[in-house]
Structure formats: structure tokens, C-alpha cells
């Protein structure tokens, strides 16, 4: 399963860490506005690869874990490229 996580903060990072337990063969892709967060997530093994918007259509699941004030900015980009069978989930507070 290919999983894309948009937002690698507390919620997105925690999901990335825990999803490997029930789905050990999943491949996790991550996207974050902060290059530092992205590099740290790769370094810690939370994600396997960096996610590009152009690759979102290849994901089976996209988890959007960004603050609500960024949601209106990035959600159209995600929905414009998402595959027909891709599940998109927003987790935010």
C-alpha cells in the first residue's frame, strides 16, 4: 500500500510511525512545508520517500495532517491530483 502523509508534525508523524505496525509492507511518502521536518522524518525512518504533488495520484491513501488555516490552501492541490480510488482523510484540530 502506498500512503501519502501531508504534514509531518505531531499528528502526521505519529500516524507515519504507527501505520507500519499493521501494514509493515506499506511505503510511506511524506510532504511538509518545513524542509527540516521532512528531512528529520526521513532520517528517523518515519517516511520512506518525499511526496510530490504530482505523485499523489499514485497513493492508495492520503492523510492530510495540517493546521486548519492551511487546509484551504493545499486541499485543492491534493484533490486536483488524487486518483479515483484514493482515500483522502483529514485529521486536524
Region spans (language model):
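NAD(P)+-binding Rossmann beta1-loop-alpha1 motif at the extreme N-terminus of oxidoreductases
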Residues: 1-53
